[in-house]
Amino acid sequence: MPFRYRYFPEKGCLYTVGKGKVSLQEFLDYHLSIQIDNPKPVLRILADYRELDPSDLKTSDIEKLKESALNKVEAKYAKVREATVVSDLLTWGLSRQYDGSYYSELYDLQVFTDIDEARSWLELPPETVLKFDA
């Protein structure tokens, strides 16, 4: 699976990294795999997709991805703030399409090319360390 994630309960932040080519099914499986015990009311997501290749995704896939994400968080959180960090225009455009595919008071997504700007938007202090266990 091209995704890894870790939840940091003290920050209420899900940190996820995507690498390599990704299919619709892999994205959907990733959404299903996320398990967060005792979540805070507001979920912050820092999605580092700078090394993710979404070139196999179709326009219709974007709607399915957003629906899957909304289904995962509805009735669990008062608010979701996702900062998606990308490195190229294709991924940036697909991420903006994803954000615009549904309006939701619950789910606020912004797309960035700079991870520090994304962290700032999520109101994560600059000294916050988000990493995976070895």
For each feature predicted by the language model, list its residue ranges.
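Amphipathic, Lys/Arg-enriched alpha-helical "gate/interface" segment within cytosolic domains
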Residues: 1-134
